[in-house]
Every structure is written in structure tokens, then in C-alpha cells.
Amino acid sequence: MDGARLLNACIKTGVDAETYSKNFDSVWLDFSKGLGAPVGAVLAGSEEFINKSWRVKQRLGGAMRQSGVLAAMCLYALDNNISRLSNDHEVASFLGSELEKLETVEQILPIETNIVIFDLSDKTISAPNLVQKMREQGFQIGAF
């Protein structure tokens, strides 16, 4: 299971991560998306799966020296930042409500967590231009 935003879903729904992931052989959890760690992820699965994954990682050059400080940042994020994910959801909802006021926004998909997806009715506004203008206002946004 790609758990990049698993904890966002847990906060939003009240369903725990174990329940979400019980039908998967493995779960990957990212510490740098919503949790605020600079880097880091963890892969969980059966002992056999993890042992195989470890060997593949080593073959592909995935070893890191002195990764303890990064692990400490991930632990801090787990201990202190999960409860803050609901704030991200509130900010996303606020952004969606503000976007609804703009004539140039045609459709906003339902906002459930921290992802806001919308279309522009004014096709003369390029996605890269919108991204730049929103970043100037302090928003981190990507276009696809």
C-alpha cells in the first residue's frame, strides 16, 4: 500500500492505519509529506518481505551512513505532527472556499484531506503562471 497520505486518511476518518492496511502485504509510510520530516519513509510487512526488500535495497545502493539523525527527525514527526494534519485539512478547505469565489475556477473536486484539485475556466491562464502566483502568496502548489 502506498501510504504517502495514510495518516491524513486516518485523521480524517478516524480509522486507524492497521485497519486501512490489513488487506495489503506491505505498507510504505512517508515522513516528509504531511509530517514535516525533511526526508524519510518506512516500509512495513512480513519478516520475509522486509528481508527481501533489504537485499534489493542494498543491491541498488540504498544504504545510508549515519542515518540516525534522520531517524530522530522521523520519530519527532511521528510523536508531534500527526495531530497537526487536521490543520492541513482545514487550510485546504479554506483554500477551496476561497477558490470557489473566483470566476476563473470552474470545478473543485471534493476536498477531503489536504489535496485541492480544481480546473480553470479561463484557459488563457497557464498552469505554470498560476503556480508561480500562488507560490508568491505562500502556497505550495503543483499543476498536472
Language model segments and positions:
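Conserved PLP-enzyme active-site core in the AAT-like
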Residues: 1-143
